[in-house]
């Protein structure tokens, strides 16, 4: 039995092919648990799944325990929005608290990386450990799901047993960078209903339906920090060690509040004024010297100290779970929304690769992820261990 809503959307009808009676009947045998965040993408994803005939139920995950920062914590409001959408769609909404798993498997790693002077990406780890592990296991084992679904802007191809992860159709919203740790098995157990459409269409469908989330702005910032100031948040968990800011040549040009507050390639927020004997060109972070607690800067966005010829990556995850044994031509992103960089992967061992760029790149940052593609297909990726000069 499906819980297909009586609501309708002309925008949906325009952009999605009408399924045959046989397809609807086949889908009706499948139960899908969709992660409901209280945002517009998961809201519309739930509607799309209903229109496609699936048995659809929602699950709201609470991954962070609130503190006194009630101005910043949106969990209660997000739950209310998710419930309003579920009610509108006539869909059951389950609730689960994964805060303990999140603390152990995501947040502590995040803090340890910052202590080591690296710049981690907790959203990637959250997808790996929470959304496509804890959530997937709970949905399958406790709720009897055949699939989970999320509002991510990615696509999948192939059958459930040999699925590939593809970029989302909306290049501006593509989130495959954040999902590279998934295996082909996890991709095959997941549905991504908005991956085949563009964001404005998602919003229009939500407006057609009168959903509470139709005009809700996209969330920004790290999931557990929300909209609060990153520096203030980090200072509560890690003691800062102020130190000197020096040029590559060793000239002291300022003070920093703590190396953890800065990232390679950063220009804004350094607090360096005009320096006697130096040009007016802006300063950029080129190195974090942990041993001496010195932030090293250089002037000019095209300064050679900013450039890398490649990188070393470890903690590799390939979607097909097969290690790369030969040199491979492909493209790479070293940060989200970056234009693809042509490169060659050179395997060192099963969990370490050298990546050589066709052209030097700026701000290759240890702790961030390098994610590899061949055309539309996301091959996988790894964590940047070091940059190559």
Swiss-Prot record:
GO terms for molecular function: ATP binding; tRNA binding; tRNA-uridine 2-sulfurtransferase activity. ATP binds at residues 35-42, 61, 151. The active site is at 126 (nucleophile), 223 (cysteine persulfide intermediate). InterPro entries: MnmA-like, MnmA-like_C, MnmA-like_central, MnmA-like_central_sf, Rossmann-like_a/b/a_fold. CDD domains: MnmA_TRMU-like (cd01998). It is an enzyme of class 2 (transferase). Its EC number is 2.8.1.13. Residues 121-123 are annotated as: Interaction with target base in tRNA. It catalyses: S-sulfanyl-L-cysteinyl-[protein] + uridine(34) in tRNA + AH2 + ATP = 2-thiouridine(34) in tRNA + L-cysteinyl-[protein] + A + AMP + diphosphate + H(+). Residues 173-175, 335-336 are annotated as: Interaction with tRNA. It is found in: Cytoplasm. One of its GO terms (biological process) is tRNA wobble position uridine thiolation. GO terms for cellular component: cytoplasm. Disulfide bonds join 126-223. The keyword Transmembrane helix does not apply. Keywords: ATP-binding, Cytoplasm, Disulfide bond, Nucleotide-binding, RNA-binding, Transferase, tRNA processing, tRNA-binding. PANTHER family: MITOCHONDRIAL TRNA-SPECIFIC 2-THIOURIDYLASE 1, TRNA 5-METHYLAMINOMETHYL-2-THIOURIDYLATE -METHYLTRANSFERASE. Belongs to the MnmA/TRMU family. Catalyzes the 2-thiolation of uridine at the wobble position (U34) of tRNA, leading to the formation of s(2)U34. This is tRNA-specific 2-thiouridylase MnmA. It comes from Actinobacillus pleuropneumoniae serotype 5b (strain L20). The lineage of its organism: Bacteria, Pseudomonadati, Pseudomonadota, Gammaproteobacteria, Pasteurellales. The gene is mnmA.
């Amino acid at each position: 039995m499906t819980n297909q809503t009586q609501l309708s959307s002309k925008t949906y009808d325009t952009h999605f092919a009408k399924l045959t009676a046989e397809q609807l009947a086949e889908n009706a045998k499948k139960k899908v648990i969709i992660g409901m965040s209280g945002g517009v993408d998961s809201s519309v994803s739930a509607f799309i799944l209903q229109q496609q005939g699936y048995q659809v139920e929602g699950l709201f995950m609470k991954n962070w325990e609130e503190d006194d920062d009630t101005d910043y914590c949106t969990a209660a409001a997000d739950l209310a929005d998710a419930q309003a959408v579920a009610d509108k769609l006539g869909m059951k909404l389950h609730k689960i608290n994964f805060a303990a798993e999140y603390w152990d498997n995501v947040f502590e790693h995040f803090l340890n990386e910052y202590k080591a002077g690296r710049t981690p990406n907790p959203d990637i780890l959250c997808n790996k450990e929470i959304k496509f592990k804890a959530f997937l296991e709970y949905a399958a084992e406790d709720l009897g799901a055949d699939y989970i679904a999320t509002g991510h802007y990615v696509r999948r191809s192939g059958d459930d047993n040999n699925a590939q992860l593809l970029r989302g159709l909306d290049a501006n919203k593509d989130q495959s960078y954040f999902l590279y740790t998934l295996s082909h098995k996890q991709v095959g157990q997941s549905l991504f209903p908005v991956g085949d459409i563009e964001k404005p269409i998602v919003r229009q469908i939500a407006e057609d339906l009168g959903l509470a989330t139709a005009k809700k702005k996209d969330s920004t910032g790290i999931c557990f920090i929300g909209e609060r100031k990153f520096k203030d948040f980090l200072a509560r968990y890690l003691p800062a060690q102020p130190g000197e800011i020096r040029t590559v040549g060793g000239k002291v040009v300022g003070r920093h509040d703590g190396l953890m507050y800065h990232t390679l390639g950063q220009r804004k927020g350094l607090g360096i004024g005009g320096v006697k004997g130096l040009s007016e060109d802006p300063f950029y972070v080129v190195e974090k010297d942990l041993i001496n607690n010195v932030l090293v800067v250089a002037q000019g966005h095209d300064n050679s100290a900013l450039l890398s010829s490649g990188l070393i990556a470890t903690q590799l995850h390939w979607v097909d779970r097969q290690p790369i044994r030969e040199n491979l031509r492909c493209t790479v992103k070293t940060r989200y929304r970056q234009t693809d960089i042509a490169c060659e992967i050179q395997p060192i061992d099963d969990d370490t690769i050298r990546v050589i760029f066709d052209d030097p790149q700026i701000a290759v940052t240890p702790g961030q992820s390098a994610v590899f593609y061949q055309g539309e297909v996301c091959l996988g990726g790894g964590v940047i261990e070091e940059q190559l000069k």
